[in-house]
Amino acid sequence: MGAPARKRASLLLLLLATMALVSSPGWSFSQGTPATFGPVFEEQPVGLLFPEESAEDQVTLACRARASPPATYRWKMNGTEMNLEPGSRHQLMGGNLVIMSPTKAQDAGVYQCLASNPVGTVVSKEAVLRFGFLQEFSKEERDPVKTHEGWGVMLPCNPPAHYPGLSYRWLLNEFPNFIPTDGRHFVSQTTGNLYIARTNASDLGNYSCLATSHLDFSTKSVFSKFAQLNLAAEDPRLFAPSIKARFPPETYALVGQQVTLECFAFGNPVPRIKWRKVDGSLSPQWGTAEPTLQIPSVSFEDEGTYECEAENSKGRDTVQGRIIVQAQPEWLKVISDTEADIGSNLRWGCAAAGKPRPMVRWLRNGEPLASQNRVEVLAGDLRFSKLNLEDSGMYQCVAENKHGTIYASAELAVQALAPDFRQNPVRRLIPAARGGEISIPCQPRAAPKATILWSKGTEILGNSTRVTVTLDGTLIIRNISRSDEGKYTCFAENFMGKANSTGILSVRDATKITLAPSSADINVGDNLTLQCHASHDPTMDLTFTWTLDDFPVDFDKPGGHYRRASVKETIGDLTILNAQLRHGGTYTCMAQTVVDGASKEATVLVRGPPGPPGGVVVRDIGDTTVQLSWSRGFDNHSPIAKYTLQARTPPSGKWKQVRTNPVNIEGNAETAQVLGLMPWMDYEFRVSASNILGTGEPSGPSSRIRTKEAVPSVAPSGLSGGGGAPGELTINWTPMSREYQNGDGFGYLLSFRRQGSSSWQTARVPGADTQYFVYSNDSIHPYTPFEVKIRSYNRRGDGPESLTAIVYSAEEEPKVAPAKVWAKGSSSSEMNVSWEPVLQDMNGILLGYEIRYWKAGDKEAAADRVRTAGLDSSARVTGLYPNTKYHVTVRAYNRAGTGPASPSADAMTMKPPPRRPPGNISWTFSSSSLSLKWDPVVPLRNESTVTGYKMLYQNDLQPTPMLHLTSKNWIEIPVPEDIGHALVQIRTTGPGGDGIPAEVHIVRNGGTSMMVESSAVRPAHPGPVFSCMVILMLAGCQRL
């Protein structure tokens, strides 16, 4: 007997011996043991920056892994395993490492956590513990810094020793008077130095550098000694920019980091800063007119050369540097937990990206893995041949470059298992359709893979025209008939053992389509019903499914277009509501039971607006015209009638219809000329097609093109000016936007002359963003009118000239002081000031007067100032101290500044009013009036006299309060009979002003009585405030 025959006989004996056991009612399967798995990190240590001066007495590095059985933990410092004994400074709490009383000398370094259980060991990513510090500034006095007013200056910070980097601010004279970040001042966050582009008198003073360290646990700031900035006589000359704060020629950055380039220049006028990317374009989200260029999250696309340009009317200066972008390792492909059969081969692979390119190595149970025997290590590949049980364990792929290290972990479980059907037995009942085909899988759990054999009853099945056993053990029976019913058993065997599983095949009637859907043509927006009816085996449930071009139709989508018929189980009609172009195609109706199915197709054609044209190409580019061509898109079953062309430019980004030649573009055209474009402008174009059913989606945008240059066609606007230093004519205008520049090399051409003069002077000002020009000449008198015109130019020529505007040269301060200044206190907190006005002079337009006042005994430098908003010759000054003598001067002012001071005048404010309100209020009531009486208020020696009393009265019928004055300590006021309540306030008045009020609240009680509530309140807010309440009752004319 041959080997195949012996094997078949052996399996037959196994079949006969086990069939009774399989069918025995006492047969059962025991449950598997609880799953075990190796450590998987849930929390890994992260780097810490610990302040050397911290009050904290410990540092915790976290580590936690999920594992079964639970993991145990070890730690390494700088690659050496740590001795974590009880009572030492290093304690293990769970998986966390706690370092007590950390110091830089003993504890700074690289830490790793190791988690282990019987399955294997994994190591965590590395965590670096660093120690931060910030020392104090030197106690030595700083030398004064001297320069000329109008020059630029740099004040060095010279920060103390520190780690890591700092942030910087500067103080002027006192805290918290911080130097603002504006176009004239700049604080370098690289060096801490303070730069002033052009100094002026307001910069005089003492400066201190404030350095701040931001650590993980705390923030610390230190101040430098003050350094005095002294300014020599002003140098009125203009200077071209000179860049003083420069970014380095090369700046390295990691992907995702923020990159900051610094650039600041000295110059007069103050230079404007502009940034550009030499070999690309800047993101619109980045600030491009600031001393710093910040890239919030740098990417490889941001690598390149960047240029900073500082420009003013006297010239320009530039600096360039390159940003080089690198990256930490990042996984492209990682390993995953794997179960493999004993004796099989396995190939694991991992791949990482990074710059520089990462190196890859492997660990097994936390130890380096090298090629040996059956294991081959090839960079990112790990290969096993003929796996055995000892290969099980925890594996890690490690990718590293100079910027970091990453770990990918996986468990390898090598299995040796006898065939086992407990998790995946053969189906007990296997229904099949007559005339159809059935596949019965046999997939026992086994390692190595089991040999499969099938039987029907006691007959071993082999391959035939109707029966096939596939390589994976699946039994396939075709053209099924009633004779195929019965028990089918799958036998599985490997060197570990044998097993089998049985199922019963039951043959049912086939499913058929009795009414198939019909093809149809519809328009967009129409409704359509596709019919589909079927017959089936009555013992089974029937379901209908629909597909469109082999994709399932979604009936449950909210707001969808499909509805399903639900009249009868054998009817599966599909209705399309408000059909769209995307609903056209081949629909398939499938009627299915659990054993078989039948299907029929129908084609739905949906007519609609045309699809987008394609291939939009721009050629024959002129200054205001281009020629467009395109290819026809789908007409969607309705002829194209016409085309519409649109364009957009970068400034607006909005698509607008353009003029064309021909004006109306017919449906058979594939080219047209675009008219009326702007010269030297970037454009994108798109094309839309229309038919009788509407206009379709536009084409994709064309490639961006730039029209040719032309002479500017529009004059600049907003011509004005004035101001500046003596001897200067400052001319301002509105910079022309990109769409009106018409070409490169753009700038402005100014013409100006003294009013009445015959000859014009000209000045050429480069730069589209320039918005002012300063002409300096010592011969220019203050506030001299000039006639000014402006035009723009580019490299193609000069544009049209604007209308003439009158601009005045810089004003000078008034030369004459006001005379006959008089001042007198009008209350305890106010005084009146008057003066004889000065005449308008030729130095400028007088805007008003500045009143300076200070207390006797103080210096004039401490004076407060108020300005009039017009040319009034008197004013009231408020907010003064009571019973205080003040000195007062008055000066005229214009836009250039204030003139000389008048001789000082003196004024004495009044004593304050009495702080006591009127008390002991009594009353007499009649039907139409209320008489109130109170004790006279006697002022103290430090209070002003009382000349009378003010009474403020308001009732619910009269929302506007009425003021009554009396020089006596009583008053009678009318009280309408129909009021509900009224409010009365009584206070003293006199030379020192009004005193604190006593408030009386009157509420009518019935027809003949009212209640009076009295309280003394401070006049802090307008609403009624009640305290120290006194309640009186008014009843007829009697006093209680």
Curated annotation (Swiss-Prot):
Residues 1-30 form the signal peptide. CDD domains: FN3, Ig2_Contactin-2-like, Ig4_Contactin-2-like, Ig5_Contactin. A motif (Cell attachment site) lies at residues 796-798. Belongs to the immunoglobulin superfamily. Contactin family. It holds the Pfam family Ig_3. It is found in: Cell membrane. It comes from Mus musculus. Residues 897-922 are annotated as: Disordered. GO terms for cellular component: axon; axon initial segment; cell surface; juxtaparanode region of axon; myelin sheath; neuron projection; neuronal cell body; node of Ranvier. InterPro entries: Contactin-1_2_Ig1 (IPR047102), FN3_dom (IPR003961), FN3_sf (IPR036116), Ig-like_dom (IPR007110), Ig-like_dom_sf (IPR036179), Ig-like_fold (IPR013783), Ig_I-set (IPR013098), Ig_sub (IPR003599). Glycans are attached at N78, N200, N206, N463, N479, N500, N527, N777, N832, N920, N942. Keywords: Cell adhesion, Cell membrane, Disulfide bond, Glycoprotein, GPI-anchor, Immunoglobulin domain, Lipoprotein, Membrane, Repeat, Signal. Its main location: membrane. Residues 39-130, 135-224, 241-324, 329-413, 419-506, 511-605 form the Ig-like C2-type domain. One of its GO terms (biological process) is protein processing. This is Contactin-2. In conjunction with another transmembrane protein, CNTNAP2, contributes to the organization of axonal domains at nodes of Ranvier by maintaining voltage-gated potassium channels at the juxtaparanodal region. One of its GO terms (molecular function) is cell adhesion mediator activity. Residues 1015-1040 form a propeptide. It is a lipid-anchor; GPI-anchor. A lipid is attached at S1014 (GPI-anchor amidated serine).
